[in-house]
Amino acid sequence: MTARHVVFSHGKESGPWGRKISSLAEVARSEGYEAHSVDYRGIEDPRQRVARLVEFCKELAGDLVLVGSSLGGYVAVASASLLHARGIFLMAPALYLPGLPELRESVLDCPATVVHGWRDDVVPFEHSVRFAQAYHSALHLLESDHNLHNQIRVIQYLFEYFLIALDLPALAFE
């Protein structure tokens, strides 16, 4: 059987095994994935974070699912095609923000699910709407703020569905 990996990318102000990542890692393991989290602390430049993720994933053989929160969402999107990711799951992704390098127009070639809080005052939820429209991604807008901590249980269910759907025929994401 092919090895299956979920690789988490945390946000700018958090760490590799924060509350959201730890809770989603449990879901990943229950679905037969190995869970990994890249430590970006001390790396401010998004391009360096992308390079760090690509380097980390070179050591992993098998199917790869990327999960990113905030700036980690940007890193996951920017890396997905380079790593031939099977899918990406994004939480309040820092997309289309001033100061971040622009993403290539056809950057994504795998299924994506985006979760964002209506009350996010760090990254406007409209940025996730724009991304979901551009890439025909599933989008879940929740009653929450940027950290989404009050919705972790819901996000766990959404992530579980996302992982299960990856094993279904392409219809699951159409």
Positions of predicted regions on the chain:
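Conserved loop-alpha-helix segment in the C-terminal half of the alpha/beta-hydrolase fold
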Residues: 118-137
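Short beta-strand/loop motif that positions the catalytic acidic residue
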Residues: 107-109, 114-116, 120
